[in-house]
């Protein structure tokens, strides 16, 4: 069950299946370190902490800005409403996608703290076990046409729900030990009507493959994208 709880100028939205006692400490990496529950980390725009909850392993991420503006205003966003905060929006989008059968992480808890006209935010979501992103995998070996088709199918499922993944790239697509395809990182993504943006998602993904082929010499060829599109079009 999805519930919310207010703590002064802070609010938590959470799934009571995974969080029985919502508290602000859940979003503090030092709390998890003191409990000896940090099981790993990953570094990107900031540090994502992997923490062990009683029934699930979670990824704790603090929302940070990127680009030049992010150097000036690192983690403050304009407050409009609780539902419009980055964390709450991503939480509910993940819930919508999972209910539609798309392979995305379970949303566990979202946090936002209002500071006057601005807010800061964090998200706890499921850590996908035994999974690697496409960049990591393709630096080691190529993928079969069948796996590329499965990637295309998963993207098509997301599009059928009407969700625009505005940062669809090969860092945000995972494959686990069972060869299940997962799509992650839905910050700033949103539901959208129409179809034109779907091709924009695919074009962005193809640019990502080409970029990493030059940058990291990944094992990827143009024919692999045709296999991905075959899977995608099979769902249309």
UniProtKB/Swiss-Prot annotation:
Catalytic activity: an alpha-Kdo-(2->6)-lipid IVA + ATP = a 4-O-phospho-alpha-Kdo-(2->6)-lipid IVA + ADP + H(+)
InterPro entries: KDO_kinase, Kinase-like_dom_sf
Pathway stated in the Swiss-Prot or TrEMBL entry: Bacterial outer membrane biogenesis; LPS core biosynthesis
Signal peptide start and end residues: none
Its membrane topology: Peripheral membrane protein
Phosphoprotein keyword on record: no
Protein name in the entry: 3-deoxy-D-manno-octulosonic acid kinase
